[in-house]
């Protein structure tokens, strides 16, 4: 650890104003992130954006809590007042999914992601926005990155439901087929997520009016909009079968 600390001290001096960058130490890859000392944007952004040091300390605290619980999250290797270092967690699933033309591989990687999400929820954590770019794959393991800022807020069950719905939306956003989505959701349920799936279906039914508001704009062919419509069109028939 002391050797890593000394090495990091040196590269901090040499890295200029880089906020996030990777480096290798003793044959292993790490990522270093610095606090955002200069807040970019207009005057309102600077007034209302949370104190960067407080937000940064909260980000470190999240990682410490997740690591202590052995949750599927990036491992904190080193921390300081204005920086932290995590072990490399692998390649983003979004990139792996886009690069591959092998449907079996796509199914396998999405199923792994679904099981990891269920595992995170089983430990009573929620991510907040499990986009595929925030899930990394390495050596057969999935790790979550960039947990939402409201990590410590209440109503954990609702946050888990939001995770699952965002995850399904993200799969459609990446143009996954209904078959791949069904396989991933089944893996989530098999890994202990039935209660959250049921509650998520209830929420889909409760907010189904949004589907009818969005549908007339389908012709715009916007990625997030199309994914939202596909999410409703996938889940609403399932809701009907549960009645």
Q: What are the residue ranges of the model-derived segments?
A:
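The N-lobe alphaC helix and its flanking beta3-alphaC-beta4 segment of protein kinase-like domains
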Residues: 49-69
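Catalytic-loop of the protein kinase fold
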Residues: 122-132
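Conserved hydrophobic alpha-helix
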Residues: 66, 117-123
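ATP-binding glycine-rich loop module of kinase domains
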Residues: 10-11, 16-56
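C-lobe/activation-segment region of protein kinase-like
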Residues: 143, 147-243
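Conserved structural core of kinase catalytic domains
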Residues: 52-55, 73-110
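Conserved protein kinase catalytic/activation segment
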Residues: 134-144
